[in-house]
Amino acid sequence: MITNAALIPIRNSSTRLPNKSLKKIKNNLRSIDIVIERAKKTNFFVILTTSTESSDDVLVDIAKEHSIAIFRGSLNNKIKRWYDCLKTFEIQNALIVDGDDLCFDYDIGIRSIQQLTSSSSELITHTKNIVPGFFTYAMT
């Protein structure tokens, strides 16, 4: 059983900007590299959650590069992918870090899991005083 995990849902088949996670921000630094490194700062078990589509095969290699876990599931049903990942890895608490969220604040993520585990809540979302994009969801 994994007590706390950071799930990074991402896929490359976006219609608005395909392969956006692979876009280079500076030199050879891809946007997904930034998100993964920020998620690792939580010290939670980090899992890249993607689809079983061939367009997402490259994400398996990226997970290996960063020494994080990979989970492959539904392409179009992100919530099912989360659920299946939670069940497969037997995760007690999960922090969702959007794969294109370069501004994710890992400290807020850590505090959200702390709040989640110290209360009877099942879901925590951002409050009005936190800019959306710095934090998404924590759930048990």
Named regions from a protein language model:
Residues 3-8, 32, 45-48:
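Hydrophobic targeting segments
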Residues 30-46, 61, 65-66:
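A short, N-terminal amphipathic alpha-helix
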Residues 43, 91, 118-122:
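Short, high-confidence coil segments that cap the C-terminus of an alpha-helix
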Residues 61, 104-140:
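Conserved core of the sugar-phosphate nucleotidyltransferase
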Residues 1-18:
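N-terminal nucleotide-binding beta1-loop-alpha1 segment
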Residues 64-77, 87:
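Conserved donor nucleotide-binding strand/loop of the catalytic core
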Residues 51-56:
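A conserved acidic beta->alpha catalytic loop
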